[in-house]
């Protein structure tokens, strides 16, 4: 059965994911190291993991596989889940796939190196999360859930 895993730290689409999971009657695991208000939805499990680097990511990576969908912005976690056969989405609806995950990891590493080489440079962060990002995410989540359900059957 398909499970929707949400890497919940700084996830702007948790509520949207819950609505979609409920509509599809999917189990949803919202994984964090704390600070989340548990959902009253019986399909949603709030998983609180111990503090520590990448503990939530490890929890998800150990469980996600073929027929599941993972929502995360964490590229190393996405790589592990893609390798395990799960379908993986960013919060803006962009899919991590076997075809693009290597490039995503390389770009992440390059950007980390550039930031480390220029400690005085302006970081700035990413662009704000928009209504278009939210709509793109919802469309992509619907598509990936249907595909994951097919994966789980075959």
UniProtKB/Swiss-Prot annotation:
It comes from Ruegeria pomeroyi (strain ATCC 700808 / DSM 15171 / DSS-3). Belongs to the UPF0178 family. It holds the Pfam family DUF188. This is UPF0178 protein SPO3827.
